[in-house]
Design a protein with these regions (language model features):
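Terminal connector regions
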Residues: 111-161
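Sec/Tat signal peptide C-region and signal peptidase I cleavage site
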Residues: 23-29
Length: 161
């Protein structure tokens, strides 16, 4: 019986080590870019229960300049409704983002203008090739003494030449 337990522990240890190898080997070199057009899907409400009730969510666009040396410029941050139309433009001019700095844009929980399947179009540029920014959406609701949160990541639609 003791031998069986020991072999089981060894198997678990080997499995854990192999998983570490898989995960540590999955790091990929990131290409540098001079600019991108990105789409970030966000969800301002989710259905729940048998009656298809909707739970409203606050949405935060989180944009982080990951380059430790170069600034980037945000040239477009538009909130896009479920119908594909621009609901709100957050920028009227270029907005600089220093190296390693972050910026947030918020859609309040009570704001229903985008519909359930809204999104953001984000465009940025840089004079020199840089690490692309990290662009994520965080959706949160804390109703009924329970927390609910979702995170989405942006998709690249186009690279600046």
């Amino acid at each position: 019986m003791r031998i069986g337990l020991r072999m089981g522990a060894e198997i678990w240890a080997l499995l854990a080590l192999s998983m570490l190898g898989v995960f540590s080997g999955s790091v990929v070199a990131v290409e540098h870019s001079r600019g991108q057009k990105l789409f970030l899907p966000v969800y301002s409400e989710v259905a729940y229960g048998d009656r298809r009730a909707a739970l409203n969510l606050a949405v935060t666009l989180m944009l982080r300049n990951l380059d430790s040396d170069q600034s980037i410029a945000l040239t477009r941050v538009d909130y896009i409704g479920a119908n594909g139309a621009v609901v709100r433009s957050f920028l009227t001019e270029k907005h600089g983002l220093k190296a390693m700095a972050a910026e947030t844009f918020v859609i309040r929980e009570s704001d229903r203008t985008g519909g359930a399947s809204a999104g953001f179009l984000v465009e940025w540029e840089s004079r020199e090739p840089v690490l692309p920014p990290l662009v994520e959406g965080v959706m949160v609701n804390g109703a009924y003494n329970q927390g609910m949160a979702f995170v989405t990541s942006a998709r690249v639609l186009a690279e600046k030449p």
